[in-house]
Amino acid sequence: MPLACFVLITLTTFGCGGDSPLTSPTPSPTIPTISTVPAQSPTPAVCPEDLTEERADTVIFGAQAGDFLADRFSLTSGDFNGDGFADVLVGAPLADGPANDRTDGGEAYVVFGGPSLPPVIDLAERAADLTLFGQEADDNLGFTVASGDVNGDGVDDVLAGARFAANGGRASVGAAYAVYGGPDLGGASDIADGQQDLTIAGDDAGDYWGFALTAADVNGDGIDDVILGGSSADGPGDERHDAGSVAVVLGSGELGGRIDLGLDPPHLVVHGARAGDTLPNFMAAGDLDGDGREELLLGAPFADRGDPTKERAGAAYIVHVSDTAGSLDLASGGGFTSIVGADRRDGLGFFVATGDVNGDGIDDAIVGARDADGVDNERGNAGEVHVLLGSPDLPPSLDLAAGSLDATIHGVDTTDSLGFTVATGDLKGDGVQDILAGAPVADSCGNSRSDGGEVYTIAGGTSLGVALDLADGGFMRLLYGAEAGDELGFSLATGDIDGDGRDDIIAGSLLADGPDNAREDAGQAYVVLSR
């Protein structure tokens, strides 16, 4: 099949292989706009300005059918070899290990950035610059990946979660691993041979520690800390089934070896508010109150806060991490801001991100609600993305039913699921973060490709509007999935891969089928350079 049918649409564009222009509507006056396109238009004869195989910047093909390269939490970037270029870190949680003898053990790959990446990186034909192998069959290593300097040497480290890893005969406790970055990073690291620098193992069977994973400096010491989620942990005293928990393990120059959460209490444990919340579905971190330390942004899309009218409305939490070790219970007490979804089954918090999108020097919270129903609730499951601007005066609670946050971005069509993934990055090189939003089940290219998927980029800046309906345009760039069922936007990240001072888009198509459609559901990841 052709590589992903991404699209860069300018104010006047021409169909790929054709010469009839498409005229864009008037851009939204509230959002700075580089280029727009009619988001709901008759199906074109050809997808405007297709990014065909010849025009792709870089595509990474999963090695084998069914690997699920670029799963939902399996994509990020970081400078892992310290050369000044961002590198791609992508997981394949259903890959089968070094000799294909660990079914679904999982793998994670690092592809080094540089001034010119090859247009095609086929993991079946060439090894990644670094490959991590899961320890045992069914571990699902690479279901989550993250980056951060957790040992304080100035170079980003590779982090990968294995949500189904066992610990001492306890099944599916989950684990997270780190391989420390540096100029000599490369080759292979097999968890079965102890070739990782750090292991954090869960404690109770079925907790799924490593389901979510990030790194951030939450205590302000200049070293990133490891934050991992156990989405099915059962809360204080194991009395809240599947409430979920988050553990903070402080980074340091001495961090390494093996940490067992059952024997070595972490710095902080955050407990989900109610049974079934499965905190965190995803998490991010940023300095959301401007105090110089990063707060946690935790998503709980199945939360209802005990209100039957809010069934699965979802919630997101901004958690301030104390210097004092201990626990924080989201069912009571302070130390956090809660954001509650507007309507039942909105799924607020399905994906979250942080970044300074209005340029005031304080990070902002970006929260996806993949099942929200759009403008006036008239587009079922179109999806929404909500923006809460950071501030030293964050309130203790916010309910979207009482009014929107500082900005809301609405999906175009019913069942698009905008906000399934979100990310931020400085795509324009102006020092302000822009917003990226994935809609992996959108019918791309004028609704001609069922579930082809789409990715939108929205310009950040001081004129970021209160509401943006993507059906009216107002976005910078629109990327289209190549074929029906590819689900472009299933994963999403940014990083300055080519070192030009602008972040580039990294997007995954979980169900793409590899070269010539010969590897069903191998998965693909794409690097789309900012221009």
What are these regions (language model features)?
Residues 70-85, 91, 142-155, 210-223, ...:
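Beta-propeller blade termini
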Residues 95-99, 164-169, 233-237, 303-307, ...:
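Short glycine/acidic-enriched loop and turn motifs that connect beta-strands
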